[in-house]
């Protein structure tokens, strides 16, 4: 039976990512594995926004830090013994599979599916697709065609996202 010891879970503040995070917590507990929770701020897309809002990157950083701290608390309270968080800047498509996976010696990367439609996915591609193509280890993409009606996010709440949108 395959066991995992270093699991990387990529989160972005979406409900799909939180759904995948919940699955990652379960896998980490079953394998008594270290769980590294990662958020990559795609700084390339923010440069144009900063013309309008000079504090946009700072807001994004604070949002990511609060998100990661919330996920760490949930994982720890759920019984994951070794939890680490990482905040990076750059392209998630490259940073996650080509840099972070090697740095933490990941043997499993988990991520959720994006909220992109077919046209957007064709034009820009998806982060999960890039991870699958470039990862040096196993990858589990947690699919959700539609989240269950009773799913309530604990961390990536509407209130948290709205707090950093203004």
From Swiss-Prot:
Protein name, UniProt field: Putative universal stress protein SAOUHSC_01819
Phylogenetic placement of the source organism: Bacteria, Bacillati, Bacillota, Bacilli, Bacillales
Family to which the UniProt record says this protein belongs: Belongs to the universal stress protein A family.
Keywords noted in UniProt: Cytoplasm
Intracellular or extracellular location(s): Cytoplasm
Recorded GO CC terms: cytoplasm
Highest taxon listed in the record's lineage: Bacteria
InterPro entries: Rossmann-like_a/b/a_fold, Universal_stress_UspA, UspA
Location (main, coarse): cytoplasm
């Amino acid at each position: 039976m395959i066991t995992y010891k270093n699991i990387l879970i990529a989160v972005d503040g979406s409900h799909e990512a939180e759904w995948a995070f919940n699955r990652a917590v379960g896998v980490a507990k079953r394998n008594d594995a270290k769980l590294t929770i990662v958020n990559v701020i795609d700084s390339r897309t923010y440069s144009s926004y900063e013309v309008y809002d000079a504090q946009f990157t700072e807001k994004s950083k604070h949002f990511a830090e609060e998100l990661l701290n919330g996920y760490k608390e949930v994982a720890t309270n759920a019984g994951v013994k070794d939890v680490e968080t990482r905040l990076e800047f750059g392209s998630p498509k490259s940073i996650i599979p080509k840099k972070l996976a090697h740095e933490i010696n990941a043997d499993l990367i988990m991520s959720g599916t994006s909220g992109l439609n077919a046209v957007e996915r064709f034009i820009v591609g998806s982060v999960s697709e890039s991870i699958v193509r470039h990862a040096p280890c196993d990858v589990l993409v947690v699919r959700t065609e539609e989240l269950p009606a009773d799913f309530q996010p604990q961390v990536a709440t509407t209130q948290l996202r709205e707090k950093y949108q203004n």
